[in-house]
Amino acid sequence: MRKTIALGVALCFGAACAEVKSQDAWEWHDGSALPQEGRGFSDTATPYVRIPDRLRGNCSGAVWGLSRNSSGICYRFSTDSRQMRVKWTVGDPVLSTHNMTGAGRSGVDVYGWDEGTKTWRFVKGSRPKKTDNEISFPWTPGRPCMIYLPLYNEVVRFEVGVLKGSKVAPLPPRASGVSKPVVCYGTSITHGASASRPGLSWTAQAARRADVPFVNLGFAGSGKMEPSMVDVVAEIDASLYVLDCLWNMSPKLVEERFEPFVRELHRRRPTTPILCAEDCSTFRDRTEKGIMAEKIVAKLKAEDPVAWKDLHFIPNTEQMARDCEETVDGCHPNDCGMRQMGIGFGNRYKQILGLK
């Protein structure tokens, strides 16, 4: 009798699974129609790139190429579907590199809101094996969802599937009340190297910690504060600008570009706070350029304490512990280092923006 009941339950469960897996049971929503965050410009060539064609002349060749990567772009929505599927296609067949996993470079990352802890919790990652990929997972109807796009690859297609008849809706405004993004301009570390998956980049972790949207303008090896890049950064109406470029700059470049860049950004957005970040290293004490940058910030604040009251500096001691365990190569943070940076920057966001 027990065997008969168990067999019946198994058959019913199997039939339900088969029905859900049937292509006819799904409705697909293209990324262009889903509630999206993290894209600083509405007129990009596709929904998955970071800088529009009209600003190509402001970018170096390297920055322009890297702006095709979807780092920081994410989707936030709720659905009453009990199961979801995600399909995406990346443009670069090189899915992983020496210091980036396939999941981080080319994968998507799914988070769900946990009402009990009031935090976003990891739900489903991905292991891309080719340029076309798909994942599926059960879902609690009504639970808020957030899906991060790949850090270091170009997305050419993105779709979310829900069971037919299910609704997909944007999330309500954040509890923090912050609607304008934190705009992070920087280097490969800002870009996301070397988080094992997109949701573990420090920019994503800091944003979740402070409950704010963010835009990622990190460009590997290319965060050099060129004067023309002020146009790109300042065009985005931000709640806070984060400048994390020292890793890619020599002392000479810091001397030439740091102060003019900060002054021009402040001139264009005089009421928006600016957070300048020191570079840091596992193996070295403070660098000459880090000390230079801190002195420039202090000089500006002394020059006019009222005008520059919202200019801030985050030292390396608030970013990584420098215990030799937080990087993959002595420079790029691993997940441990990314968490340390996410906490440090997230705490600063809350302090600067007056959040609890």
Say what each PLM segment does:
Residues 1-4:
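Positively charged n-region of N-terminal signal peptides that target proteins for export
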Residues 17, 214-216, 313-314:
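Conserved beta-strand scaffold positions in the cores of enzyme catalytic domains, especially
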Residues 130, 143, 150-159, 178-263, ...:
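Conserved SGNH/GDSL esterase-like catalytic core that processes O-acyl groups on lipids
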Residues 273-275, 318-319:
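A short, hydrophobic beta-strand element within the central beta-sheet of small alpha/beta folds
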Residues 284-356:
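Catalytic His-Asp segment of secreted/periplasmic serine-dependent ester chemistry enzymes
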